[in-house]
Amino acid sequence: MADWYRLAWPLICGLDPERAHHLAIRALALGLAGHDRAADDPVLACSLWGRRFANPLGLAAGFDKNGEVADALFDLGFGFVEVGTVTPRPQAGNPRPRLFRLTQDRAVINRMGFNNQGMEAMAARFVRARPRGVLGINLGKNKTTEDAAGDYEAGIAKLAPLADYLVINVSSPNTPGLRALQGREPLSLLIARARAALDAACPGLRPPLLLKVAPDLTDEDMADIAEVALGGGLDGLICTNTTIARPKSLVSDHAGETGGLSGLPLRYRARQVIARLYGLTKGALPLIGVGGIGDGAEAYARIRAGASLIQIYSALVYEGPGLVGRIKRDLAQRLRADGFASVAEAVGADHRDPKGASGKLAPRSPL
């Protein structure tokens, strides 16, 4: 934990979590969150989808829902930033309280419900000032929309020209019926319409189209998603969103709250999903690993399991912005210790040599 963040932690804990989040956005907007001036180790550099990433560590969607502070987030040292989830129309989300810290478990439960200012506000912001790093935009549907694919088409039409990659989010547990879109038939239809919308919006060089999936998938579900992804024109998968499962190990007061659980308890399951989907796709589809990553050891484990890139979010709540640099330094050391000259060389290494990882992996979670 950065010294200033450690000192501020008692004050942060005393604030309502959503209030603390708004203050964090404000601090970033004012340039008060700091700047990582250290150059990234060259071993961390990645190339994917024709884009260059200075390092593979990104910020997951959900933090900067409206694209207000992307440049300030790049200043913290992230290799890429994913904003959103954004919907075609502004919406308030679910009633408060809807965000809960599980401090003893190093976890968070949220039932935000895609609260955001809408795609027009985000587009206007990025037209005025395009963020200087690799930018992902995470797309969702409005709660009251019956034609879900129509909302994703609208988001693609408006925001595709402004993004380095787009994400179709059908895995949040906080929008009724959304996860049903992960089934083989509805997903195939959705991806076909999204791809057509993307081709129309960017007839030349189009941004990659990714799908964000849930951790609460059966082996059959994952096989279906892999088949659709490979045959339906997706450029990658993000694994995983929050879980509706509640491991018996949770001890925090808010463990029984409704919503999606993120953070440390999700670590093993999210890694397991990455490994499974890497195997099902035979490494042919880039994967972004997210869920329970809070240190360099797990970042490295996720890459060895099959992730080309990784993302964090919940761990920042407990560790602060200094975590970004710590993960990158540790990851670089682990790559070199195992003889890898690049991140790309390590992707999926456990499928080739499951006993070759340096360091000790996190224990298996009961989730």
From Swiss-Prot:
One GO term (biological process): 'de novo' pyrimidine nucleobase biosynthetic process
Keywords (alphabetical) are:
Cell membrane, Flavoprotein, FMN, Membrane, Oxidoreductase, Pyrimidine biosynthesis
PROSITE patterns listed in its UniProt record: DHODEHASE_1, DHODEHASE_2
Q: Where does FMN bind?
A: 61-65, 85, 138, 169, 212, 240, 263, 292, 313-314
Q: Name one GO cellular component term.
A: cytoplasm
Record's bilayer topology term: Peripheral membrane protein
Places the protein is found? Cell membrane
Please, which domain of life does this record's source organism belong to?
Bacteria
Coarse class of the protein's main subcellular location: membrane
Q: What is this protein called?
A: Dihydroorotate dehydrogenase (quinone)
This protein's species is Rhodospirillum rubrum (strain ATCC 11170 / ATH 1.1.1 / DSM 467 / LMG 4362 / NCIMB 8255 / S1)
